[in-house]
Amino acid sequence: MDLTQIQNPSFLKEMSISELEGLSEDIRKFLIEELSQTGGHIAPNLGVVELTIALHKLFDSPKDKFLWDVGHQSYVHKILTGRAKEFGTLRQYQGLCGFPKRCESEHDVWETGHSSTSLSAAMGMALARDLKKTKEYVIPIIGDGALTGGMALEALNHIGHEKTDMIVILNDNEMSIAPNVGALHNVLGRLRTAGKYHWVKDELEYILKKIPAVGGKVAATAEKIKDSLKYLLVSGVFFEELGFTYLGPVDGHDYEKLFETLQYAKKTKGPVLVHVITKKGKGYKPAESDVIGTWHGTGPYKIESGDFVKPKEVAPAWSAVVSETVLKLARTDERIVAITPAMPVGSKLEKFQKEFPDRMIDVGIAEQHATTMAAGMATQGMKPFLAIYSTFLQRAYDQVVHDICRQNLNVFIGIDRSGLVGADGETHQGVFDISFLRHLPNMVLMMPKDENEGQHLVYTAMQYEDGPIALRYARGNGLGVHMDEELKAIPIGSWETLKEGTQAAILTFGTTIPMAMEAAERLEKAGVSVKVVNARFIKPMDEAYLHDLLGKNIPILTIEEACLIGGFGTGVVEFASENGYHSALVERMGIPDRFIEHGSVTKLLEEIGLTTDAVVDRIHTMIPSKQKRA
């Protein structure tokens, strides 16, 4: 079937099971071929082909609402709703988004990039439906570990209490990104082997009613014996106790079983949870055999061999630099523990996990818990290293404020994927952390200019005992610089002059330092002398350095790959104002006040005007012509 000709899912209504099976093969082939060129979340989508087709066949989207959680499972949904022809642009600038996007299609009713939000949103939609007295199904599809998130459990509790009509699809592939962890995962494991409790209960009631004379009376007591029955037949009754009708487990690749179960769910009042067992990566051997999450989300790859197409790496990944330095220090300090919220592979903690399994803690998709747990460990003299993506640290803001900073606890937060991350887009750009951490009392915030300085700042963080400290580091690789053998502590709040200059100064840090250095060199050739400063401590700032610089009364430009509002540049402006430098000219470059879409980092930087050319132009506008050398 030519998938690019699909306009909407209505064509599925008339298809037989054998035709649907052929469509499944076509979709898997399409995904494998297309994603080999663009990269993307291949394994999660190969696992939900039959489930997605079954949902679109039995329900009526967009009247009926599908909410995908996590949203990277929505590729098949996008194909069935008329977007196959755009897959060549997947996750590229102004191309097809890798997550549901409301502006893309009326079938995308909810946007998800972070996990565990679908049930709360679905509850809101269902309550709105009931208040408006309309009739549509609300169907959140939750999987890839999203059910372990605290927000999802809060929603389950409320939905079950209110008995709201809703069909929750639990897509259980036994993995999130890496293998699932936690007691809830164990509950699901028992349910997978428990058989179909509800089918048995209904059969028993039917048989009881057939008994002459007493059958009706006996059947009337069925509800009273329901608890005993479910404990007899099901080893895990978690969802029933929360107030849901539990259906399953059902084979998520068997159309007959899916149709039977979903039709039953449609006729059931109150909240229903359909437990669907799927195989992550189904139909592509390299993805099927993956047990650690390598094929969860990928770049381009070679279909036949399963080898990834990667540019030759001349420098280590930032995540590896940080995690391996932590590991090196952990070998001589038993107090060091590593904590991750379901991202051991992305944060490059596999080596730490292998060497110190009892000191490596993966809490699952539970950022709030991970953060406060780290705080608890710090109260007992441990040295927790919390490795967390910038975008996911947003979810633990209150815990950072209330539990870490307020108590001034020695927690080292490794803020991975800081700055623009590219293809994952606006839900994942790590551009807000400076603004929401800089204003917190007791917090120290750093970002290195290169991987050598990065390892020294990790050492600095582990030696620091006066409160919380955080290190920002980017997605991708370092610069390939020489790495010192011996680690050293860098004085807290100290900046570094990278290039001397007399007519203007650029204050920056991290990934924008190469941009600043190149701009300064070009300006030097044009007769403009510009100082470049490595402001590696975003907080506290080097106040002595700032006093000296502001006292020279030369234009200052701050550059940051982070949002301008409340950012580093704002801090410099505040310092100048509060210390009486009212004639100082301080201008800022950074991320504007909007969400940044998906695309390559280079393209996105061009789009927002954060380039070497833009820096050169800005400095020229800041320096009066009469001050420029010929």
From Swiss-Prot:
Positions contributing to thiamine diphosphate binding? H72, G113, H114, S115, G145, A146, N173, Y284, E367
Q: Could you say which residues bind Mg(2+) here?
A: D144, N173
Q: What is its EC number?
A: 2.2.1.7
Cofactor binding comment, as recorded: Binds 1 Mg(2+) ion per subunit. Binds 1 thiamine pyrophosphate per subunit.
Keyword Transferase on entry: yes
Q: Name one GO cellular component term.
A: cytosol
Molecular function GO terms recorded: 1-deoxy-D-xylulose-5-phosphate synthase activity; magnesium ion binding; thiamine pyrophosphate binding
Q: Which chemical reaction does it catalyze?
A: D-glyceraldehyde 3-phosphate + pyruvate + H(+) = 1-deoxy-D-xylulose 5-phosphate + CO2
The protein's matches in InterPro entries, at most eight in alphabetical order, are given as:
Dxylulose-5-P_synthase, THDP-binding, Transketo_C/PFOR_II, Transketolase-like_Pyr-bd, Transketolase_BS, Transketolase_C, Transketolase_CS
Query: Needs which cofactor?
Result: Mg(2+); thiamine diphosphate
Pathway(s) where this gene product acts: Metabolic intermediate biosynthesis; 1-deoxy-D-xylulose 5-phosphate biosynthesis; 1-deoxy-D-xylulose 5-phosphate from D-glyceraldehyde 3-phosphate and pyruvate: step 1/1
Instruction: Output the GO biological process annotations, alphabetical, semicolon-separated.
Output: 1-deoxy-D-xylulose 5-phosphate biosynthetic process; isopentenyl diphosphate biosynthetic process, methylerythritol 4-phosphate pathway; terpenoid biosynthetic process; thiamine biosynthetic process
Keywords assigned by UniProt, alphabetized: Isoprene biosynthesis, Magnesium, Metal-binding, Thiamine biosynthesis, Thiamine pyrophosphate, Transferase
Domain of life (superkingdom): Bacteria
Query: A Pfam family for this UniProt protein?
Result: DXP_synthase_N
Quaternary data: Homodimer.
According to its UniProt entry, what is the function of this protein?
Catalyzes the acyloin condensation reaction between C atoms 2 and 3 of pyruvate and glyceraldehyde 3-phosphate to yield 1-deoxy-D-xylulose-5-phosphate (DXP).
Protein family: Belongs to the transketolase family. DXPS subfamily.
Q: What is the official name of this protein in its record?
A: 1-deoxy-D-xylulose-5-phosphate synthase
Encoding gene (name)? dxs
